[in-house]
């Protein structure tokens, strides 16, 4: 989702009109009513058992009617990521989780249901987006579950003090969720800056050359996405080498590659590319570990 709000300034002609009070004679027409909300649902996998309000078998997500930051869609990437989180409980249970650019907030809600100790779900500091996230939290969580999640605004690359303020003093997050964000190529550096500042650096495992993959309990980030613009897939993937070179270095591995269907049937580009969700996990390199890509966890 874009983190570049567009700022405008008045030109000399507009200033002149304001000075002469012409706006009083020719008032601007009222803005049209915002598009109505829409709703989407996520069906909980049959092999997963936890309580949802009203004993529903699905989570209900309200989507903003329209938004330049694309919060008006429930992306297939979020669905695939949520299923991965439910089927890989060790990566979420009893963890502090932060989701960036959350949209409707589905993965964050799933993390709470899966047993995360604290979840902070964020998006750009736009009140319409944040109010919608609060609505989805209220609809899908109850009681103590609702106490384990908070909604906050954050602009990537800016101060993370408000985000860390949700945790006990001196602590950071064990898991970061980035769902369909890397398409925003101009914001890779800002996104990495937030990642570096919020993920805990404490490692529970030492590097084992015979097993190059970090344990799933290692502090890590999940980066799931679809190449919505196939001709720019290389620019999406540029996020990872850039991440690998940041800080003290990062390693990353593919954990998911799944056909989910193209979001928009008539968009240009190979439909198979546009409809495949890719999931990666990244972690800070441990002592003696080389940065960069590791062998995939999946059989392609």
Swiss-Prot record:
Its EC number is 2.1.1.-. The keyword Methyltransferase applies. S-adenosyl-L-methionine binds at residues 75, 101-103, 123, 156, 179. GO terms for biological process: methylation. Keywords: Cytoplasm, Methyltransferase, S-adenosyl-L-methionine, Transferase. It comes from the Eukaryota. It is found in: Cytoplasm. One of its GO terms (molecular function) is protein methyltransferase activity. GO terms for cellular component: cytoplasm. It is an enzyme of class 2 (transferase). Pfam families: Methyltransf_16. Belongs to the class I-like SAM-binding methyltransferase superfamily. EFM7 family. PANTHER family: HEPATOCELLULAR CARCINOMA-ASSOCIATED ANTIGEN (PTHR14614), PROTEIN N-TERMINAL AND LYSINE N-METHYLTRANSFERASE EFM7 (PTHR14614:SF10). S-adenosyl-L-methionine-dependent protein methyltransferase that trimethylates the N-terminal glycine 'Gly-2' of elongation factor 1-alpha, before also catalyzing the mono- and dimethylation of 'Lys-3'. This is Protein N-terminal and lysine N-methyltransferase EFM7. The lineage of its organism: Eukaryota, Fungi, Dikarya, Basidiomycota, Agaricomycotina.
């Amino acid at each position: 989702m874009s983190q570049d709000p567009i700022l405008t300034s008045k030109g000399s002609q507009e200033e002149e009109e304001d000075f002469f009070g012409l706006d009083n004679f020719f008032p601007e027409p009222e803005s049209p009513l915002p598009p109505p909300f829409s709703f989407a649902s996520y069906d909980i996998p049959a092999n997963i058992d936890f309580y949802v309000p009203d004993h529903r078998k699905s989570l209900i997500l309200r989507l903003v009617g329209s938004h330049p930051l694309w919060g008006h869609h429930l992306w297939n990437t979020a669905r695939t990521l949520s299923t991965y989180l439910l089927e890989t409980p060790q990566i979420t249970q009893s963890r502090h989780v932060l989701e960036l650019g959350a949209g409707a907030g589905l993965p964050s809600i799933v993390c709470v249901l899966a047993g995360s100790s604290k979840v902070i779900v964020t998006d750009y500091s736009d009140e319409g987006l944040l109010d919608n996230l609060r609505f989805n939290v209220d609809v899908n969580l109850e009681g103590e579950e609702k106490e384990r999640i908070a909604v906050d605004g954050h602009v990537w690359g800016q101060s993370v003090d408000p985000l860390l303020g949700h945790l006990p003093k001196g602590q950071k997050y064990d898991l970061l969720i980035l769902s369909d964000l890397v398409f925003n190529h101009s914001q890779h550096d800002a996104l990495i800056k937030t990642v570096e500042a919020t993920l805990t650096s404490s490692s529970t495992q030492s590097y084992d050359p015979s097993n190059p993959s970090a344990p799933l309990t290692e502090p890590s980030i999940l980066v799931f996405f679809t190449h919505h613009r196939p001709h720019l897939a290389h620019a999406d993937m540029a996020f990872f080498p850039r991440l690998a070179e940041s800080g003290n270095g990062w390693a990353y591995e593919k954990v998911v590659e799944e056909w989910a269907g193209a979001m928009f049937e008539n968009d240009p580009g190979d439909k198979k590319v546009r409809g495949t969700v890719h999931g990666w996990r990244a972690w800070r390199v441990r002592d003696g570990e080389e940065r960069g890509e590791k062998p995939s966890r999946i059989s392609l």
